[in-house]
Design a protein with these regions (language model features):
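A glycine-rich phosphate-binding loop feature that marks nucleotide/adenosyl-phosphate handling sites
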Residues: 39-40, 185-192, 250, 278-285
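Hydrophobic transmembrane alpha-helical segments of multi-pass transport and channel proteins
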Residues: 264-265
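A short, flexible helix-boundary coil/loop motif
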Residues: 238, 242-243, 268-285
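Amphipathic alpha-helical/coiled-coil segments positioned at domain termini
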Residues: 252-253, 257
């Protein structure tokens, strides 16, 4: 998962951001508001802080409801007082977007988690320290020998892993100039055994008809697949894939390509300096 540079999303944060944006919009257009609700929002923010406390949960829910009401009041006021030509041409789409964010409920699908990055989606990881991540799903493919990255794809939808395979294999074919015969994946990709001309191999129990050589070969290949995990870890920690600061889906693709290019360039530089060292050593000898 390539996480986006957004704060942890909550309904209260989104409502407060919408209210602040509407107040700035009114000030920019020179509209005199009946109320800006700035002082009330400070108190409501304090009430929402204790949402997890059993005795203060109802108070927090009321505070969230009040924040949404304030945002709707400001939207209606701006619709009345803004010039009609400016409203319908420039700001109507923006107001509809805010209303959609305010109408979101707990179990809704395709929710908006950020006002400046609306394409971000939630990915459930199931880890103890971080159960959910907010960004976009990424596929990385490397060679069996050399750990050179030959295919990277940024997905704009939260697809099942098996549904991401065709796009990744297509990108590998473009990069290498030839199709892959065998792709070794983890168990998250179960569901497909063949994609076009590529055989998908997953770690599973050996077949009865397999001889010892075939069993050992499959076991070694599946163990070799685990080498992609530290590569992804290095891309996140050393090559800025852990947090994406570029905007939009195009920014996701650019950041991923730059990280993969940096990884391959680093491997090429290491190989080049080793060759230079050996040549110099031979010359001195």
């Amino acid at each position: 998962v390539q996480e986006k540079n957004i704060t942890y999303p909550t309904d209260a944060k989104l409502a407060i951001k919408i209210i602040n944006r509407l107040n700035k919009l009114a000030k920019f257009h020179g509209i005199s508001q009946r109320r800006t609700f700035v002082k009330e929002i400070k108190n409501l923010r304090l009430s929402i802080r204790h949402f997890r406390h059993v005795k203060k949960r109802s108070k927090a829910r009321k505070a969230l409801k009040r924040l949404r009401t304030i945002a709707h009041i400001l939207i209606r006021e701006l619709r009345r007082k803004l010039p009609q030509t400016c409203l319908f041409e420039c700001l109507q789409e923006q107001f509809l977007f805010y209303e959609r964010v305010l109408a979101q409920q707990l179990r809704d699908k395709n929710k908006i988690y950020s006002l400046h990055e609306p394409q971000v989606y939630c990915i459930a990881k199931g880890k103890d320290h971080k159960q959910y991540e907010y960004g976009n799903k990424v596929s990385v493919a490397s060679t069996a020998k050399g750990n050179i990255i030959v295919g990277v794809v940024s997905h704009d939808k939260n697809l099942h892993d098996s549904h991401t395979l065709p796009e990744v294999l297509r990108h590998i074919e473009v990069t290498r100039g030839s199709a892959v015969k065998t792709a070794i994946c983890d168990r998250g990709y179960r569901g497909k055994s063949q994609v076009n001309e590529t055989t998908i191999q997953l770690p599973k129990k050996p077949l009865k008809r397999d001889n010892r050589y075939q069993r050992d070969k499959k076991r070694k290949q599946c163990r070799r697949r685990a080498a992609i995990e530290p590569i992804i870890g290095h891309l996140k920690s050393d090559f800025r894939l852990s947090r994406n600061f570029l905007k939009g889906t195009l920014g996701d693709e650019i950041n991923l390509l730059m990280a993969a290019t940096a990884w391959n360039l680093r491997k090429w530089l290491i190989a080049f300096f080793w060759w230079l060292f050996l040549v110099r050593k031979e010359a001195l000898d």
